[in-house]
Amino acid sequence: MPKPLIALDADGVLLDLSLGYASVWERAFGVRPAERDPEAYWPFDRWAVERLEDEASRARFRNHFDESFWEAVPAIDGAVDACVRLHDAGFHLVCVSALDAPWQAARLRNLRRHGFPIERVIATGNAGTAVSPKADAIAELSPEAFVDDYLPYFRGLPAQVHTALILRGPNGSPNVGEELRLVRSSHADLAAFADHWLAR
């Protein structure tokens, strides 16, 4: 009998993309940015970095989001342990990430190197549509639960999927408003979700 499945977002749930953002800035410009607001949702607001006005600087920054970056994004504290607990309780874990397809294998290597018990990553891309770019993947997987930290990614998901929102970075968070009705439960982090899910 197949194991019950839980789908997990990567950035903001398993991995700290905001911390990785600071490392990219340092690689691109040679200076590690100071932390401006540890409670900021968006990396640009968390770190004391200037807005890049010219295309050359923007391209220089973007070019450092390369394979070596996607293989080395830091794990969020407690996320590996939360996944191990879910895995040991009999759940099959799949990562569904709004990442461009060329970085899918690098993302899986990143997760495996941290010790996440995850053997599959689905990179959906991030096309701006009325429904979540992850909706088709979630419909195909039909997981018991889907955990994400970005409220718009719950748009258009199958009604039977338990939608769990990670409420990180309250300052400037998009996780507000009427669309909170799309969420079945909310948690401070993945460890708190695991506590909730395993206590049912």
Question: Which residues does each PLM region occupy?
Answer:
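Surface-exposed amphipathic alpha-helices with a cationic face
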Residues: 83-87, 139, 158
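Metal-dependent phosphoesterase signature
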Residues: 45-78, 91
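Substrate-recognition "cap/lid" segment bordering the active-site pocket of phosphatases
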Residues: 100-145, 151-155
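Substrate-recognition element of Asp-dependent hydrolases with the DxDx(T/V) motif
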Residues: 70-71, 79-110, 121-124
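Structural recognition of alpha->loop->beta junctions
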Residues: 109, 113-124, 178-198
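Active-site neighborhood of HAD-like aspartate-dependent phosphohydrolases
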Residues: 1-57
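Acidic, Mg2+-coordinating phosphoryl-transfer loop and its flanking beta/alpha structural elements
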Residues: 143-185
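Hydrophobic anchor at the start of a short beta-strand
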Residues: 92-94, 118, 144, 163-164
